[in-house]
């Protein structure tokens, strides 16, 4: 696993300008469900328009930023709960090296997990498992992390995330299993941190259970900042959403994470504010590799890349886009047209 990750040490770092530029010309793992028509939130056509830069601007949703914000926390908790170390969480795997040019995957990382065998089955060993296993084994896995803002967490992988996971497995030959990590985080004021169910109930409904862990996220300005820090965990829902919308814009802030179970704010310079978090659900679902998945789906990726190239090289990209939409077997839906009208020039 370590040798495989080192192969991509010089790849564009995730969320860097080079990474964004590269992904605009490729079908990434997170694009795949949309390209395959499996994403209920974004279609083939909207993804095509997005890649062709036909939007007025890149959309920046609070829910997406929420997921990005808590990805690091989920990795810290995974390492703690499973006694492991996540590596390769910043690499970009270009599928060209395996014969899939134009396709890529940016994994949330790789780690070793301990599997314990008992009662004729294997399970993932965590610090919460008080079980005496008949035998154990350590295996390398791909990590995929999601932290939904509102969506109810179920004990299964949502169908529209399966292509992203299988893409990562297909482009990682040494790995035969992935884990889908899904966590439910809630925001709280610093004074609410600890072994209790207190949260900001203006942002999310109250929780009846106790948290698995908690901690602090600190936001610092990249410029000199001398005002008193604000407890963002006490904001009302509308203001907190606005805060999330601007968090990753124009490199205004740096984000710092406490270790789990911390309750004291760190001593730092240029602190704009901070907020507490609590995690109430943290589930780890194993996903086995389907060896033929990418081979079977790659023709659709190639068609998408062909459509994208047609638009980008056309003297009239909008006309080329509209022609593609009208000639496909599944034309734009009413919902797509509404979204299209709002987002395109």
UniProtKB/Swiss-Prot annotation:
Keywords linked to the UniProt accession? Host cytoplasm, Host-virus interaction, Inhibition of host NF-kappa-B by virus
Which GO BP annotation is one of this protein's? symbiont-mediated suppression of host NF-kappaB cascade
Question: What InterPro entries does this protein's entry cite?
Answer: NF-kappa-B_Signaling_Reg, PDDEXK-like_dom_sf, Restrct_endonuc-II-like, YqaJ_viral_recombinase
Q: Does the keyword Metal-binding apply?
A: no
Q: Which residues form a coiled coil?
A: none
Compartments reported by the entry:
Host cytoplasm
Give the chief site where it resides: host cell
An example GO CC term for this entry is: host cell cytoplasm
Pfam families referenced in this protein's UniProt entry, alphabetically: YqaJ (PF09588)
Keyword presence, Repeat: no
What quaternary arrangement does the UniProt entry report?
Interacts with IKKA/CHUK and IKBKB.
What is stated as this protein's family in its record?
A: Belongs to the asfivirus D345L family.
Role of this protein: Plays a role in the negative regulation of host NF-kappa-B signaling pathway. Mechanistically, recruits IKKA/CHUK and IKBKB to suppress their kinase activity towards NFKBIA.
In Swiss-Prot or TrEMBL terms, this protein is called: Protein D345L
- Kindly list the organism's lineage: Viruses, Varidnaviria, Bamfordvirae, Nucleocytoviricota, Pokkesviricetes
């Amino acid at each position: 696993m370590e040798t495989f990750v080192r192969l991509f040490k010089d790849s564009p770092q995730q969320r860097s300008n080079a990474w964004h530029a590269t992904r605009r010309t490729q079908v990434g793992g997170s694009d795949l469900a949309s390209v395959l028509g499996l994403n209920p939130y974004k279609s083939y056509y909207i993804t095509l328009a997005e890649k062709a830069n036909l939007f007025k601007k890149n959309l920046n949703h609070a829910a997406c930023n929420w997921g990005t914000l808590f990805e690091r926390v989920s990795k810290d908790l995974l390492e703690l709960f499973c006694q492991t170390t996540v590596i390769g969480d910043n690499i970009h795997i270009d599928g060209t090296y395996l014969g899939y040019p134009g396709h890529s995957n940016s994994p949330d990382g790789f780690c070793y997990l301990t599997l314990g065998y008992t009662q004729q089955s294997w399970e993932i060993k965590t610090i919460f498992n008080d079980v005496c296993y008949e035998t154990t084994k350590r295996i390398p896995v791909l990590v995929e992390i999601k932290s939904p803002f509102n969506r109810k967490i179920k004990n299964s992988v949502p169908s529209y995330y399966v292509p992203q996971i299988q893409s990562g497995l297909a482009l990682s030959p040494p790995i035969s299993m992935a884990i889908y990590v899904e966590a439910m985080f809630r925001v709280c004021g610093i004074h609410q941190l600890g072994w209790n169910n207190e949260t900001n109930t203006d942002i999310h409904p109250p929780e009846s259970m106790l948290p698995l862990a908690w901690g602090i996220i600190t936001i610092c300005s990249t410029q000199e900042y001398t005002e008193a820090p604000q407890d963002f965990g006490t904001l009302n829902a509308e203001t907190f959403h606005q805060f999330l919308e601007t968090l990753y814009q124009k490199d205004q802030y740096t984000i710092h994470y406490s270790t789990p179970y911390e309750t004291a704010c760190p001593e730092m310079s240029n602190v704009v504010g901070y907020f507490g978090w609590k995690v109430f659900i943290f589930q780890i679902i194993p996903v086995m590799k389907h060896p033929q998945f990418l081979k079977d789906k790659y023709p659709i990726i190639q068609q998408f890349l062909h459509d994208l190239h047609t638009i980008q090289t056309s003297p009239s990209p909008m006309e080329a886009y509209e022609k593609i939409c009208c000639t496909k077997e599944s034309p734009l839906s009413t919902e797509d047209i509404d979204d299209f009208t709002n987002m395109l020039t």
